[in-house]
Amino acid sequence: MLKFAMTLTLLVKFAIAALALSLLSACGTPYASVANRAGEPVMLLGYDPVAYFTVGAPTKGNAQFKTNLPDRTYYFASAENQALFAANPTKYEPQYGGFCASGAAFAIKLGSDPTAWQIYNRRLFIFGDVLGQTAWQLDPAWNVDHADKLWPSIAAKGWRAASLQAYAFKVPHYKTGAQIKSEYELKNPSKPWPSYDPGGMVKNLFSKQPGWRSAEGFGQAAQGYPD
């Protein structure tokens, strides 16, 4: 009976992986972008990537100042910021395609909230929500190390496919939400774990785009979709 159950589990995992592979080219862009009215794949819900460094705060960009790169478009708050970006895009682009830096440590391309961010070692990291940011801050170096190693293998994959594969075949260092919460509570006995509903796998992987919670105000202030 145990052998049968193990075989069934493996079959289910292979079925999920096969589905994920079929989605690689059709479902989910490789970047955490959302389409504007013109159909352009806008990053950071239209927030200015340069302003995180120059202003130290999330700052809305303007479609008047935009730069189109392969598979992604950035808005800027000013022509000056646009010029800074043009001179050195690598310096200002968010890490891991703008996906949640916490999820990237487990090969998951999920979530993007431009108001949940951190600059660490001169690199911009974006998180899917307050839970992802809180988890990442437990050990930034650990998360960056694992994400940097995994990212080359998933960078070109659509976000749905990459995430489905990651859930089906978890990396050896995978941690559940409960495990991360337990680590947090041990390190921060006087601070409660953030109360936040991430929205569920169906919405996050199938019916919504990266950044939908931030854009639509799901449990937080609505940032809106880019024009």
Predicted features along the sequence, with ranges:
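Beta-edge loop/turn motif
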Residues: 78-81, 129
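Intrinsically disordered, low-complexity terminal tails and linkers in eukaryotic proteins, enriched
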Residues: 27-70, 91-227
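Bacterial N-terminal signal peptides
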Residues: 5, 11-25
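Short, well-structured hydrophobic secondary-structure segments
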Residues: 69-78
